[in-house]
Amino acid sequence: MDILNPTKPLSSSLFNTHFRRPTLLLNSKILKLKPQTHTLYSNNNKRSRLSVTIVTCSKLKTSKEIKEKDKNASGKILLSNSAPPVLSEESGGGGGNGEKVPVKTGTGALGFLKRLPRKVLAVLSNLPLAIGEMFSIAVLMALGTLIDQGEAPEFYFQKFPEENPLLGFFTWKWVLTLGFDHMYSSPVFLGMLALLGVSLMACTYTTQIPLAKVARRWNYLHSADAIRKQEFSDNLPKASVQDLGVILMGAGYEVFLKGPSLYAFKGLAGRFSPIGVHLAMLLIMGGATLSATGSFRGSVTVPQGLNFVVGDVLGPSGFLSTPTEAFNTEVHVNRFYMDYYDGGDIKQFHTDLSLFDLNGKEVMRKTISVNDPLRYGGITMYQTDWSISALQVRKDDEGPFNLAMAPLKISGDNKLYGTFLPVGDVNSPNVKGISMLARDLQSIVLYDQEGKFVGVRRPNSKLPIDIDGMQIIIEDAIGSSGLELKTDPGVPVVYAGFGALMLTTCLSYLSHSQLIANVCVHFVSYSGKSKIWALQDGTAVIVGGKTNRAKAEFQYEINLLLDKVPEIVESSLSKQSDVASG
Amino acid sequence: MIFLTLEHILTHISFSVVSIVIIIHFLTLLVNEFVGLYDSSEKGMLTTFFCLTGLLITRWIYSGHLPISDLYESLIFLSWIFSIIHMVPYFKKHKNYLSTITAPSTFFTQGFATWGLLTDMHQSKILVPALQSQWLIMHVSMMVSGYAALLCGSLLSAALLVITFRKVIRIVGKNNNLLNDSFPVDEIQYMMEKKSIFKNTFFPSSRNYYRFQLIQQLDHWGFRILSIGFLFLTIGILSGAVWANEAWGSYWNWDPKETWAFITWTIFAIYFHTRTNKNLEGLNSAIVASIGFLIIWICYFGVNLLGIGLHSYGSFTLISN
């Protein structure tokens, strides 16, 4: 080709014939060869590994020459075999062919080192490897849900005993050495995720981007024979390529016309969106890493009316966690209250928070609830929990006393709090008193000294209750608000990734479903591409096409489209032949 | 009270209609000539669809929130989505094999919802504080739609597997007789893929040609429905993550339900990747999708059955308190 080029630049059409055709042949070869390149690939890997072991075994300098020979041999085989996927990126680019030759001849130690990253890339972008990674991540995650997470070692000694191993081999030793007791932060799992991330990058770099480039390249076929050799071909007597072009455009093809030649393809959008999906995944992974290494978390239960400082609650989670100015903010819980359904169940709980800076100035005030957090200076405060901290009780117009409430353990998810008002001599060993129980801030159940039920009072009702001659008024029930605080620098990145992922998934679906109406063109990476060539040959048009998927449907579609091409009546024939010659 | 009666009536109408539709489907399977019956079964599915819509709307009105807050409601919603998936090709005047999957699916989910273990769950319940968010509609509807579409697609893939395996066994037998030479399964697949059907000389009989076409159709429809399901699942998981960042304090908590949804997502991502690879396409992708069927059920049902994690709302547990 390089020899031919300088001799033929006189007419542009001739130039095209000789320049474009080989690239196209190369492309088609690549597509056809794909099933075979795979097996070669795996051979490659073995070979490259072999050569590496040789290098490491023979560290003696005397064997250097043998080593180099070895490398040469392996390098040559590797290049010729692994070339197709990489070459597809370069060969059509025009000048790419010139570069290819020196690489082949100049295989030495240096060349080997130069090509090493490329080989690593080729291994990493290997699809079966990526599938294996995804599969093992899925299995690890499933294991993580089956094995109870974050328990003490004794728990695993009991659950996975050595005497009676699960499936014959699975004991606590496996769980603890592999870190499956904290699966989602175990080195095995994180390593697998990192590997998948690297594979994603390699695949995007070596396979997807070059294929998208190839898809954009125009290649016309200028001989009728070449077109007839396509998987699908047809001969339309009395037709014009222009008409065909219009019809193809209507069917969603990108159409390029030059003189009598037509080239049309579709499936380009379906090629760019997978790149977007992969980039979005990488963005999410990056954001998650940032979250894991650079965030602060903490939770606190604050009774109504008390304060806390943000910085005291938050604890760092990774080495990138750095405190900010906002950590000095003081938070005051103005009020904690709950909403109830008519049936008495809790509907929602709210906390009225005020934020003060170092000078004691109120910088923000907001009532938060579940699903409605407060955000200030990168800190987010969530309403997550509640409890009852104290009862304000008046006894015979004395007080009010603050009685601390303690959580009582009952089965089920319901909460129960209780307190005790001693009656009589407080210092006696078996002191008796009035018990008060509360499920929520709505109503308090009172029991007398014998433990008999007396009645129910609502706080704030000011309605006294008479127990053994004592007048008890429950003034108020003071709740405490369970807050969770966090700073997370990864969230914007992750959200950007979410947005991108959603968009690109939609795009790849839409781009492909729009085509699917006609041709089944596929979803991920190097798939779903149909090409059509046509050539005006006198009054006839020769049409050829190929696709890499759904051949039957492609033929069906093309037949439908070709039926639409209008037949040219005699009078306009002369005009057509003009076009053909011009 | 009127709402409850209405709901009762609608449940029973839709369930009996869908049972009749199933019977008609079986009849048309046995006897091909009943074109009129096929049409009436389509009308039956339309009736089911409207009944289920009515059921969901009634529940929405009297409970005051979107009726997908517990297992019973989500099962009804699931069968509603199945009936939608059934309707769409019908309106596009496409006769396809999807309907043989969607109609029984509607039947089974609805049957389970109305008859199964869940009788005490029929009363609609109040929403716990964490569920009171606009995200509920987006997240749950997307997830359930995703499950429905993915279930349909994976069932189609399973059907493909069954048909392919039957075919391959038969062909291998033939080859043994004629050529005294057996082909590995993959090789036959590969040859089938590689050769254009119209120039197909390897399997000249028309019977094999129709089979091949059936397999292609199953593959095509399975892929279409799976890709839309995957889209829904992606949106569902992402909206769930955003919601979790509003309600639970983090966008990802490794909660069992969350994890299984991610496993489902990964499995179907593997499906789409196997399909693009020419070496692995066809059979292998169908196998992956069939695995996906099990995974979806574990995710949708199994996790709630265990009653663990943050997602254990409105489900029944096997261990009673």
Curated annotation (Swiss-Prot), chain B:
Broad class of where this protein is predominantly found: plastid
Subcellular location: Plastid, Chloroplast thylakoid membrane
GO molecular function list: heme binding
GO biological process, one term: cytochrome complex assembly
Similarity field: Belongs to the CcmF/CycK/Ccl1/NrfE/CcsA family.
HAMAP family per record: CytC_CcsA
PANTHER family per UniProt: CYTOCHROME B_B6 PROTEIN-RELATED, HEME EXPORTER PROTEIN C
Self-association state and partner proteins as the record states: May interact with Ccs1.
Cited function: Required during biogenesis of c-type cytochromes (cytochrome c6 and cytochrome f) at the step of heme attachment.
Protein name: Cytochrome c biogenesis protein CcsA
Originating organism: Populus alba
Gene it is expressed from: ccsA
